[in-house]
């Protein structure tokens, strides 16, 4: 997984963070949540996104997905395709903007 920051807060009161994130085939994040939510805009390849307890969603370039505040989820590339997305979120103080949890198992990833 490669992360390239695009935008971050520069002035008092600004909270938006934007990054380009690239995934090799089969690569994915760990389970995590965001205090103020997260928006993902797919730019290349095939993305897999899943909220805990929900069905895995497949997304393609041009599609935008939203993960609500506090929703545990993971995202990554499909098993046979590179994937790139823009990740956008507002930073938060308490709790932190991103709370990282356990790794996504191969069984969870492939289900």
Enumerate the predicted regions with their spans.
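Double-stranded beta-helix
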Residues: 1, 8, 13-14, 74-111
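A short glycine-rich, His/Asp/Glu-containing loop-to-beta-strand
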Residues: 1-30, 37
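Short, conserved beta-strand element in jelly-roll/cupin
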Residues: 20-24, 33-49, 88-91
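Histidine-centered divalent metal-coordination motifs
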Residues: 32-34, 73-75
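Short acidic-glycine-tyrosine-enriched beta hairpin
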Residues: 53-70
């Amino acid at each position: 997984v490669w992360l390239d920051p695009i935008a971050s807060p520069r002035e008092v009161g600004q909270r938006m963070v934007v990054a380009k994130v690239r995934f090799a085939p089969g690569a994915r994040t760990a389970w995590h949540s965001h205090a103020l939510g997260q928006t993902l805009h797919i730019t290349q390849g095939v993305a897999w996104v899943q909220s805990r307890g929900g069905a895995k969603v497949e997304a393609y370039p041009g599609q935008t997905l939203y993960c609500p505040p506090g929703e545990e989820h993971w995202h990554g590339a499909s098993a046979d395709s590179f994937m790139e997305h823009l990740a956008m979120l507002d930073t938060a103080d308490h709790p932190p903007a991103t709370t990282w949890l356990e790794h996504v198992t191969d069984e969870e990833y492939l289900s």
